[in-house]
Structures are given as structure tokens and as C-alpha cells.
Amino acid sequence: MYIQVLGSAAGGGFPQWNCNCVNCKGYRDGTLRATARTQSSIALSDDGVHWVLCNASPDIRAQLQAFAPMQPARALRDTGINAIVLLDSQIDHTTGLLSLREGCPHQVWCTDMVHQDLTTGFPLFNMLSHWNGGLQWNRIELEGSFVIEACPNLKFTPFPLRSAAPPYSPHRFDPHPGDNLGLLVEDTRTGGKLFYAPGLGQVDGKLLAMMHDADCLLVDGTLWEDDEMQRRGVGTRTGREMGHLAQNGPGGMLEVLDGFSRQRKVLIHINNTNPILDEDSPERAEVLRRGVEVAFDGMSIEL
């Protein structure tokens, strides 16, 4: 299985265009040793030619431009994208669909709840129906697994996550199974397994079992502290309220990941306020000391 990190930041990217927190300002004035990041998205393939896009970031055009296999140039109009899987209906995971309209129709896999949001509150399916067939919906059931024709050796097993629907959603404060998903993806030829959960607010026993079954854990790295947005003066909500488990402290993501010695462990969906973006920070050193990597745009993983 080929895993390509197209974007590794949370919503807004890093540096965020309108933010002057210590990280964003430090990056711009050159006092912070850090790497710019676009908004979270990955691509998966079983042959390095046909790709499944997981979430469509607002930065999708730049992300595709930076990854040569996404333009194989086999025809006058071409793309390496053969299907799209949406893990939720968040704006920073779906807006990129608008920039992919020239390539319609697209095969899009998502749950009933995500499809409901994307046909009502943020009606991308309706809007894009005018472009050569638009978005062709393939329902993700919450039980069992599915296979996408373009990558027949990849088996996708979805699992619901406890997190919130987008602010625009009619059921923002009435969560339903299927609002947010993670994926366990297995390459049935190599046996390699990826656990992918960029928005992970709580880890229960069932998820721990799935994580132990995986070879690579690509998980939520949004915040260092649960109250980080408040500490940085850029927001009022905690990580838990937003559906993100912070890295630091008892029960935090790093403590969870300490329980895995065999797996490759990688943080993704990193918010611009997170001190681990500062490559010279003690927080970054602590992450690395505990055997955890920090995803970056262009990162490649093979399983």
C-alpha cells in the first residue's frame, strides 16, 4: 500500500492566512524553524498509479501539483484520482471537491450523515450535478468493509468516531453515528494495515483493538494541550469540545500511543497553534523521544 500525505495541517493550514500567533508570526519572520503545511488530506494506492483521495482539502490544487502521480498524462485530460472517500463533511475536508469539478464525474464514498450534510447545509452534490454528472454517491455502511474498484487490493473498514458534525450541520449538537469516520485500510496482498483517524476525540477499547491490528497509526495531532486555543488567545473551545484528543497530559494521545511498540506512529491534522510545529521546541523533542513522527506535506509511507 502506498500512502501519500498531501496535506498535514488542520483547518486553515500553517501558517494560517489571518493568524499572528507565536507559530504563524514566527514562521513568517524567520524566527521559528518550521515547515509550512497545507490542510489535511491523504491519498492511497495499491499500485502507485490508481489513487483514492481521502478528504478533499481546500488546498487540493496545490497538493495535486506537488505530487507527480496525480497527473499521469495518459490523455489530453487525466488524473490519478480514481475515487474519493470523505471521512466527514467538514468544510476543510470537502471544499476541495469544488476545485475538482473539471474532472467530474467523481466516485465519492461517504456515509448517509455526510451525504445529508452535503446535500442540504453545504450542498456540494447538488451544486456539482451540473458538471458532467457531478459526484456519484457510494454509500459507506457502518458495518463491514468495502472495496473500491480502482484499487481492488485495498480493503476499507470504516469505524464511527465520537466527534461533532460541522458548525453548519443541522445536527451539530445532535451527533449521529456516521458524522465522523476513521478507516482501517488493509492491503490484501502485503497484509499491511493503516489506521487513519485525523479527527479522534476519544479512544475506547474497540478502537485500541483496531490500532493494535494495524502497522501504521496515522492519527489526530491537532492540539498539544486541550485548552490550547484559549491559551493562545485564538479561541474559546477546548480540543475535546471540537472532537480532538490533545497530545499532552494523562489520557492524551501520546499516552495512548505509548501502548504501541510495533506500529509506526504518525501525527497528522496539526493545528497552527500546536508547539510541535516548532522543530526546536521541547514539545517536538518530547514527541520524537516517544517514538512518534510528525507528518509533513509530501510524506510517503509504504506498507
From Swiss-Prot:
Keywords linked to the UniProt accession: PQQ biosynthesis, Transport
Alphabetized CDD domains for the sequence: PQQB-like_MBL-fold
Bilayer-spanning residue ranges: none
Keyword set includes Protein biosynthesis: no
Domain of life: Bacteria
PANTHER family on file: COENZYME PQQ SYNTHESIS PROTEIN B (PTHR42663:SF7), HYDROLASE C777.06C-RELATED-RELATED (PTHR42663)
Functional description taken from the UniProt entry: May be involved in the transport of PQQ or its precursor to the periplasm.
The protein, known as: Coenzyme PQQ synthesis protein B
Gene of this entry: pqqB
